[in-house]
Amino acid sequence: MELSPLQPVNENMLMNKKKNEDGKKRLSIERIYQKKTQLEHILLRPDTYIGSVELVTQQMWVYDEDVGINYREVTFVPGLYKIFDEILVNAADNKQRDPKMSCIRVTIDPENNVISIWNNGKGIPVVEHKVEKIYVPALIFGQLLTSSNYDDDEKKVTGGRNGYGAKLCNIFSTKFTVETASREYKKMFKQTWMDNMGRAGDMELKPFSGEDYTCITFQPDLSKFKMQSLDKDIVALMVRRAYDIAGSTKDVKVFLNGNSLPVKGFRSYVDLYLKDKVDETGNSLKVIHEQVNPRWEVCLTMSERGFQQISFVNSIATSKGGRHVDYVADQIVSKLVDVVKKKNKGGVAVKAHQVKNHMWIFVNALIENPTFDSQTKENMTLQAKSFGSTCQLSEKFIKAAIGCGIVESILNWVKFKAQIQLNKKCSAVKHTKIKGIPKLDDANDAGSRNSTECTLILTEGDSAKTLAVSGLGVVGRDKYGVFPLRGKILNVREASHKQIMENAEINNIIKIVGLQYKKNYEDEDSLKTLRYGKIMIMTDQDQDGSHIKGLLINFIHHNWPSLLRHRFLEEFITPIVKVSKNKQEIAFYSLPEFEEWKSSTPNHKKWKVKYYKGLGTSTSKEAKEYFADMKRHRIQFKYSGPEDDAAISLAFSKKQVDDRKEWLTNFMEDRRQRKLLGLPEDYLYGQSTSYLTYNDFINKELILFSNSDNERSIPSMVDGLKPGQRKVLFTCFKRNDKREVKVAQLAGSVAEMSSYHHGEMSLMMTIINLAQNFVGSNNLNLLQPIGQFGTRLHGGKDSASPRYIFTMLSPLARLLFPPKDDHTLRFLYDDNQRVEPEWYIPIIPMVLINGAEGIGTGWSCKIPNFDVREVVNNIRRLLDGEEPLPMLPSYKNFKGTIEELASNQYVINGEVAILDSTTIEISELPIRTWTQTYKEQVLEPMLNGTEKTPSLITDYREYHTDTTVKFVIKMTEEKLAEAERVGLHKVFKLQSSLTCNSMVLFDHVGCLKKYDTVLDILRDFFELRLKYYGLRKEWLLGMLGAESSKLNNQARFILEKIDGKIVIENKPKKELIKVLIQRGYDSDPVKAWKEAQQKVPDEEENEESDTETSTSDSAAEAGPTFNYLLDMPLWYLTKEKKDELCKQRNEKEQELNTLKQKSPSDLWKEDLAVFIEELEVVEAKEKQDEQVGLPGKAGKAKGKKAQMCADVLPSPRGKRVIPQVTVEMKAEAEKKIRKKIKSENVEGTPAEDGAEPGSLRQRIEKKQKKEPGAKKQTTLPFKPVKKGRKKNPWSDSESDVSSNESNVDVPPRQKEQRSAAAKAKFTVDLDSDEDFSGLDEKDEDEDFLPLDATPPKAKIPPKNTKKALKTQGSSMSVVDLESDVKDSVPASPGVPAADFPAETEQSKPSKKTVGVKKTATKSQSSVSTAGTKKRAAPKGTKSDSALSARVSEKPAPAKAKNSRKRKPSSSDSSDSDFERAISKGATSKKAKGEEQDFPVDLEDTIAPRAKSDRARKPIKYLEESDDDDDLF
């Protein structure tokens, strides 16, 4: 059909045409729908059975003769590879059927296209199949759908599965020959198939009597694979498979073309892959190998090309892996992920698949009836539960895996990824304008071609920025930019990647300056890529300002060290002090320089002095002056060489903890030596200073911050206070309030009176901490808690707002810190204002009473509380020349027990009793286990259970108050019985450990010192306190003598005036004074005596004092002063006043004579007696307040309300469970002791007999001298100790923590003898006895030299002879509470009763632990007796009064931790009190330590903190903290 040119053509017309043309060629239905035999189907669609028959090119592991096994690109036909592999796997399978099989021979002849595989395993049965009527070899090799693997009930670990393998090889071969021999059937079978199994040859059967074997020989039909011959690539693959079989089939020797393959097993096979492979550092890869069990063998090494695996299932090469590989890899990955996360805290998040990418795993497995995703068997799909075996890798394998380089490789990858992320924060392009940075005042030329001339000023806060902006009015804004810092920047050297990424401050600085990570700024051209050519640091001139400078230097040095060589950093300094007179003004940039000027300027008092605490003190006018004189105020940092790099690393690197300790030690020793020699303090920023090396900055300025950190964090041995606490006490003493005052108001007063320069919130928290008296806080609170100051419910964190609570001095405070001692103290000055003393000198060591805790830089302090009366009794023993008794920690009102495990290691036990078979009662928790915390973290999980642990208890009820604890807990009988077997204290976490291996304190000369025992602290305090009682007596004798002389003169003057011997009316003053001198009157004796105490008038009195005393001073300078006589009122002439004056004179003389008769020891004993008497009164009042409203008390607390109150008391029917100190606990404690001794010996410190090296100076000179009998008190180490974990070397909470084992004992300082003739000088005020001035500068060293002490007595180690009474039962004993007391407490021999007044003895508790109920007063062993006697004396050897006296003198047993005093028991009180039976197992045992504070080795020869040099500003404090006072 023709188409018209105009006729449209459509698709239907074309189709019709085609149909007509093909009509004759239409296929029949039969030809379209065909049925093929299976043989025809296999040949027609081979990819279904053997994979592709087309050539493919891909990366494969092959074996080449010249290079061995290697991974390269090969071109091969997968189908051909598969048919070869089927026959090879069949040969290997025969090993599973016949363990005796030992050899496989593979022959590959590429030229003749012949492949042969022979094995000597058990032959195929040469017997006719009775069903199929054909011989078995012909059946399984020549007929499809035949196999021995069809019985799924039989668990096989062979590669054959579907019955196709060998037949497929036959089908795709032009010739296929089977030859097998069976010794069992005594026949040999041989048959050949040709033409793709289309034609079978004749079967040959021969008799046979040799060893079994099977041999398959075939010639692949290359035409089916579109190949001409067996090329190099396919042969290389086949050879590698021969090696695979050699490695994966145990105890089978494989020959290839007649040659034995050099593979001795799977481990040997793995080495073929790793030949010449090295890691990132050039070392050979480390292989971890484990034969887990007969079915699993695993090797692991590091991979640099992503996850790699070489695996075999029943000799099949699973090139794509499968579930068997995942099963093994997941075990390894889970362990490695944990390790990587620990080592990469805060870094880039690492996921499991990223860890897996660094692993190369080799697995050889035998799996029962494996399944695959295809006939090619490259991926094993069987689920792990069906493997028929398990592969649990050993801890040894995992540990080796962690150390084989994989973890390091992952961490390097993490760093690389982190660097990529950091680089995204940087801009490689220099911008003239940048956006998105608040508070930045950019220089106009920043980012331009003049950018190298621009300077970025980094200021400490917004106020400093304002000062800088004011100064820019002088130098202009084109070249100077300003950016304020929000405090201290991050220590990037130890910060995590996450911290750096999220730190806005650091990212802003990088963006402003135009810095790029990993860029080297070596040459000038690289500097031109920056937006600023310099950074100027402008901070306050205090220690915290120095720290900020150091952190910025560290930031640049860590990331771009080359910038430091270009003088990239500089600082802007401002004055600390300015003095002015008339129009003359002098600025000083360090306090030592100011002191030098004062000493060289005779009339310096006429100059006006102004102190600058920070940049905010300067005015805008002064800012302009500073910037106008840029040469004086700009100090460049100069790089002087590798010593600068070392110094910066020393200050900020976590790895140099020990070096930093030695650095601080040397600094303190050097400062002390300079002070002793009278040398001036070393300082920076003199008048000619224009540059500063980094080394000088670190060693002369930054070190002051580190030292001040310790001063603010570690208390003084003398008064147990930190500076902030001392400021509070100083203010309270000065105010002497008779009425309560709000905490918030007191904090303001403290800031004003003691020159406190920081936020008042931390002061308020300090005040609250000083007033707290709940269990676990203070044993003696110096302030009264009037209001809610916190309770044991929340550990004090439940205190009310400081605006709502009141406080005032405790009645005991001034008895502990007698005003008479104030005149002997050395008061400090701040901003020309006299503030708190260097330390107070209490009558007992308060650091033992209230304990101490703090973390500084390099060292930490932890000391528990001790019982007040035990400490007092030990002081009395020392005063009497006796040895003090060992003391156990003790906490006021704690009803549990504390036992010693080992030296300085204790276990603290709560109280638990059994009420019935399903109920227990917890009536006390370990110290500092707060009630609410215990409920939430212990009882709630026990009640509700967790995913891993089922619930243990069925219910609990709470009956506690703010001061007592009572949980009543319900359990099933079975679980209670099991808990009893394990130990109720252990199950319910009612035991905690306490370790005191870090008793580090500042001694009286301001040196850090480590004490080995609490008795060492007590002895040091005793020597110092006794000396100061001598000084007090000397001062009182002088003062009383002067006052007596004054009264005597006044009385004589009045009498002579009355008698008319002296006429003063209408006489000139000079003549009158002359008359008084002639008649023998003394110039004001009191004033003269005070002036005599000062060789030089106090140069540091504040201006108010100067003003007030100017008149009297001028009068004094003119000659004698008789104002004390001439200023007396006229009414002193009356008879009454005259008689009173004479009486006062006589009384004063009597007082003086009485004082002369007393020794310093007598004065001390008097103070102790008065203190104890008042303590009894205070405690009685506290007890009375606690008992208000309790049952059985008088008043309204009866009936229903009384019954409710009874619920809070422990149940009288409970059977107390005695806490057990297990063998494991003691063993652990002893282990720690041995480790400590071992580490000490390793460090070179002798451990025998307490003999130790000499002083610090001797150690420096390497003279290891022994000092027999010296007290063992360790000092700052010069040898490194083991390092501890620390995130930030400058952080209070994490500073330089070392492990317990690294304590190093260093000897005590050699004491310097004081001259006996040196007369003590006292701090006095010329106008009143109530205000005190500082000591004379020249006498300062003399007064605070080491004490002139007699040779120390041989140290008696505390003996652990306080035996626990034996109890029945294994790990937990339950005893009747009544009989516990009656039967278990022996009497102890009496001792003299001289320490306490007899009338107070009756009310003392006879046992240290408030245990369970007692019905009668029994004589009980004291802690002192238990500590020194091996056996108690027989009962009844002493009378009650003697026993009472004995108990008063000696410490009570370890169990009664500061229990409330009990009067002799009566029926009323015993019914209502908590059951008081004493724990049989709770006297002294040796204890296991709690988490480690820094082991610290401190030198007692360290110089005290000099209070001159740069003005100190303490670090910023946390607003809410239990240990807020730790931060001062």
UniProtKB/Swiss-Prot annotation:
Q: Where is this site: Transition state stabilizer?
A: R803
Residues of the signal peptide: none
Q: Where in the cell is it found?
A: Cytoplasm; Nucleus, Nucleoplasm; Nucleus; Nucleus, Nucleolus
Q: Which residues carry this modification: N-acetylmethionine?
A: M1
Q: Where is this cross-link: Glycyl lysine isopeptide (Lys-Gly) (interchain with G-Cter in SUMO2)?
A: 17, 155-156, 351, 385, 396, 415, 417, 424, 439, 465, 479, 528, 583, 598, 613, 621, 624, 631, 638, 654, 661, 675, 1074, 1193, 1201, 1226, 1238, 1272, 1279, 1282, 1359, 1363, 1382, 1418, 1438, 1450, 1455, 1480, 1488
Annotated Acidic residues bias: 1098-1107, 1326-1345
Q: Partners and quaternary state? A: Homodimer. Interacts with COPS5. Interacts with RECQL5; this stimulates DNA decatenation. Interacts with SETMAR; stimulates the topoisomerase activity. Interacts with DHX9; this interaction occurs in a E2 enzyme UBE2I- and RNA-dependent manner, negatively regulates DHX9-mediated double-stranded DNA and RNA duplex helicase activity and stimulates TOP2A-mediated supercoiled DNA relaxation activity. Interacts with HNRNPU (via C-terminus); this interaction protects the topoisomerase TOP2A from degradation and positively regulates the relaxation of supercoiled DNA in a RNA-dependent manner.
Protein name listed in UniProt:
DNA topoisomerase 2-alpha
The organism encoding this protein is Mus musculus (Mouse)
Q: Which gene encodes it?
A: Top2a
